Structures are given as C-alpha cells and as structure tokens.
Amino acid sequence: GTLQDLLTARLDQLPQAKRAAQVGGALGRVFPQALIEAVNAHAASPIHLPALDPLLQALVQAGLLTAEQQGEQRLYTFRHALVRDAAHQSMLERDRRRLHAAIAAVLQAHFAALCDSQPELLALHQEQAGLWAEALAGWERAARHAARRSAHHEATAHLKRALALLARTTDGPDAAPLPGRDATELRLQLLLSGLLITTQGYAADQVRAVYDRALVLARGLGDEAALHKLRLGLEGYHFMRGDFARAQAIADEVTASLGDHPEPQARLQASWAHANILFHQGRLPEAVALTDRCLADYRQGGHRATTVQDAGVMCLC
C-alpha cells in the first residue's frame, strides 16, 4: 500500500488515540494543548474524549506526534504532514465539518488574540466547516491584514482563496445564494488589482484580467465610482505597455463620463492622465499647459488628505 495507507494503519492500532489525532489533524500540523482541550470540551464537537492527555502522550510514544514546551504552553506537532493528513481524512466528511465548526467557535470565543494576529486561521476552519459567508469575510479580513503588513503575496493568496470560494458558492454542488454577491466580488477584485500592480506591475496580464472582470461587475451594478477607478486603471495598463493610442481613447472615455460638472478629484485624475500621455508622446507644450492647469486645480482643491496617490506630486514628476 501507499505511505498514507501505512500511516492510517498505524493510527488504527491506537483506536482511542486515533480520535485525539483526528481532532489534532483538524487543528493543523502544529497545535497547542490549550486549543485541543477547548475543542474537545466544546458542545458542538463530534468528538469528546474523557481523558485527552494520556491519548496525546500515547501518540507521542508511538512516534506520531512530538511535544515541546514553549513558555507556558505545550505544543504538539505531527512528525510528518502525511500523518496529519491521514488523521484528518480518516473522519467522515459530516464529522469533519462539524469539528471545523467547533474549532471556529472555540477560536472566536477563547482565542481572540490568535484570530486577530492570524485571521486566515479562522477563515480556513470556517471554510472547511461549510460556513461560506463567514469564511468569505474571513479571507477578505486576512487579505487586508496581510496587505497592512506589506505581505503582498500573502494578501494576494488570501484574496484568490476568497474569490475561489465565491465561485464555488455560485456554481456547483456547494452553490448557495450569498447576499450582495456581485458587490462583494467587485470589492475583492478591486483590492486584488492593487496588490497585483504592486507585485507584478501595471502592465501584467493578470492585472488586465482582473480589470476586465471588475468592469463587467461594475457595469452590472451601475457603480460609477468603481467604473471611474477601473477606467483609470485600464488607461494606466495600456500606457505602461506603450499603447498610447488606446490609453488616450480610455482617458477620453473617462473625461466624457464625468459630465458637465465633474467631481474635482475625478477631473484632476483624468486631466493628469491626459497630460502624462501627451508628455510621453513628445507633445511637450500641450503636456506642460495641461499639467499647469492640473496643478492650479490641485492647489485650489485641497485633496492631499483624501488620496493615496497625490495628484499634485504626480504632476510635478
């Protein structure tokens, strides 16, 4: 048989300890004793073991777990990821979901600091419990938490996990209607676009794909603020690829969409986009004249406290 089969057979030789391994397997490769004890005691858990500690020691003696003391807490680690997988997969799917739901409840009730520092941990258990709406919010929270730490690749992975979950709940065997589904996806796609620009650059194919999907959503929702942001993003995408004609056409669309009485910040962004294109086309007198108008609008408008990318600084570049 496979190594997985051999590991499962070793667990089967310790039937009571196997139940403790199943709880530990649901918690992850490494888990603190306080957490497994709290889950074992939780009313919603499908597994309740009257004497947990001797069973954990039996798993240590069998070479399936290691134990170490870190300060005041005792940590258990599966010796190999395959041991953890064998324990986790040996449960019925129904019981696995119930166990992950219990873990999520315990984390929220008794391990708030852990949830704050590792929101992806809670999101993972909520997803594995089939708590789709909670997991979706959790993955978004984890992405924003990672982005605040400039962990951009980690944040991107969390957002892609959220989008995959959203797709799973829209179509397929796990389909379940979620309120505000398209608005949620649009928010996630906009956040993802910024992260991809940071890690891959404005001209990356993935950035274009995210913008295209987000445009479909924004048009369907009639979200003018999002459409403005996305058009400017697409203008930047084509500009950075050297397609000035396409960038100019989109910048014209942006200006036309603003109407006769545009919001000052939106007008400033559109004007700067035009000026930037003119400059790189070598049309310097036109670029300078438009940039001067942008700076005049900027000085009158007082936009500094409300923007991430300072348009006045961009005009001076």
Label each PLM-derived region with a short phrase.
Residues 93, 97, 132, 149-152, ...:
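TPR-repeat structural position
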Residues 97-101, 114-119, 154-167, 201-212, ...:
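Helix-turn-helix repeat elements of alpha-solenoid scaffolds
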Residues 132-230:
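Flexible inter-repeat linkers and adjacent short helices
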Residues 69, 110-116, 128-129, 149-151, ...:
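Short coil/turn linkers that connect adjacent helices within long alpha-helical scaffolds
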